[in-house]
Amino acid sequence: SPNDYFGGDLRGIEEKLDYLQEMGISCLYLNPIFEADSNHRYNTADYRRIDPMLGTEEDFIRLCAQARQRGIRILLDGVFSHTGSDSRYFDKKGTYGNGACDSPSSPYYPWYRFGRYPEEYESWWGFATLPNVEETEQSYGAFIHGEGGVLQHWLEAGASGWRLDVADELPDCFIRDVRRRIKAQSPDNVLLGEVWEDCSDKQGPQGRRGYVNGDELDSAMDYPLRRAILDFCAGKLDAFDAAEAMW
């Protein structure tokens, strides 16, 4: 259930850093940590606020600093293809005021694609709690990857990179802009992408996606490799078929 919570916070991670260092861990990838009304937090309510259940921005800054001292870098999860419906940007429940559902004059209104306003709108895979955003909208781009935007804010707070949620649903131009911002902060910062198929041969409406062209992702979540390894370990694939699946 998206409403079941099992504890754990940023300070808890900090308390385990010595243990993680002993294990040889060099990077921690955190699932979404920003304010949201679910436990998975892929329905972002506020990109600039740590979910209070996890801690504060000060906790995050300290975690990143302590991790870096131990040779561990922190990677954040960037959910930028959609927001939460209960967010300061969409505000379907009227929680925040001045969201896209509150008025067409809201600064966030151009971010979304409405049909019959405000009841009908495009959403991620039909989930009404996840309204899609228009990534090529100038004001949205400025908010995410512009000067002083979301990416820069959390990189300056200590993050060492981002993992893009559903990268295969983000325009190539948006990914390139995200990369430019991340690398402008430090060439060592990392940009990963969630791509469910072979990222080197992923096809989109305009043909092959440019993930591996050198100006988008540094790497991707290798789900085909994961599946091949799991199936081999479970006895569902022999060594030959596993090798074929990996290639």
Question: Where do the language-model regions lie?
Answer:
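N-terminal structural segment of carbohydrate-active enzymes
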Residues: 1-76, 81-83, 88-92, 134
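The substrate-binding groove and active-site-proximal loops of carbohydrate-active enzymes
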Residues: 1-11, 43-57, 127-143, 159-169, ...
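Alpha-helical packing segments of well-folded alpha/beta enzyme cores
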Residues: 9, 13-16, 59, 63, ...
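Short acidic catalytic loops
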Residues: 25-33, 47, 73-80, 142-170
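Short capping/connector residues at structural and topological boundaries
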Residues: 39, 47, 52, 85, ...
